[in-house]
């Protein structure tokens, strides 16, 4: 969801973003075969100011896109009843491993990527759908083979559901597809507080399309009810049993 690359590039909120940014910088320095996926945020995270009363207040402002190059790749993710087409940008500075950011093409869909960590439940699920489902589709469209997926916190968990759905569509059953997927996913979580371990109503996950045609019973097996993104990540990782 966030990458702390430079203070001029408003794609991070705090420590998780700094960690992800350092990861990408180190991978670039070492020449490791790593590719990052994120979203291009119009307003980034809040810019705080201190008011005359001494209290902090949030301010939101639109930022220029930054050092981005259009790859020409477009991917689609169905969010509820709307097909959201996303362009795929490549970050072109900061000496990092390849990093691609998705952004809706149609301005009517950019409410999804307006603000990092938008608290509205539907918006947050939609953000994580573009990151996870859209991210998998972007990697395919870029013809980048993937040996291992790393979900850093639960935000990218819907990528796992997309991969399960792909295996089912190819003729597999749910449990076999889920078991096979575990060998391709590692999961890390760093925020042992409720705010860092998102829970969504399973009805919202299903209604918005994040379940990728999986039925509610299958979604419950992965993330519980309500759907816990961290639990889903833990259950989908290598040797994941919970």
Locate the predicted segments by residue.
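Catalytic cores of carbohydrate-active enzymes across secretory and cytosolic contexts
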Residues: 1-242
């Amino acid at each position: 969801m966030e990458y702390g690359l430079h203070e001029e590039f408003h794609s991070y909120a705090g420590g998780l973003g700094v960690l992800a940014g350092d990861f990408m910088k180190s991978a670039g320095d070492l020449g490791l075969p790593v590719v990052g996926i994120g979203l291009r945020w119009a307003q980034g995270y809040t810019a705080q100011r201190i008011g005359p009363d001494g209290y902090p207040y949030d301010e939101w402002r639109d930022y220029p896109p930054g050092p981005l190059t259009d790859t020409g790749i477009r991917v689609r993710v169905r969010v509820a009843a709307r097909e959201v087409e996303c362009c795929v940008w490549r970050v072109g500075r900061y000496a990092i491993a390849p990093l691609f950011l998705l952004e809706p093409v149609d301005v009517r869909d950019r409410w999804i990527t307006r603000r990092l960590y938008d608290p509205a439940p539907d918006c947050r699920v939609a953000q994580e759908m573009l990151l996870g489902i859209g991210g998998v589709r972007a990697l395919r469209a870029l013809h980048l083979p993937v040996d291992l997926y790393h979900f850093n916190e639960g935000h990218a968990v819907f990528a796992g559901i997309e991969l399960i759905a792909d295996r089912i569509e190819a003729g597999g059953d749910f449990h076999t597809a889920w078991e096979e997927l575990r060998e391709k996913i590692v999961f890390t979580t760093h925020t042992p507080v409720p705010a860092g371990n998102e829970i969504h109503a399973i009805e919202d996950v299903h209604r918005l399309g994040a379940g990728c045609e999986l039925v509610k019973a299958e979604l419950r097996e992965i993330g519980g009810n309500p759907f816990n993104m961290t639990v889903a990540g833990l259950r989908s990782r290598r040797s994941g049993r919970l």
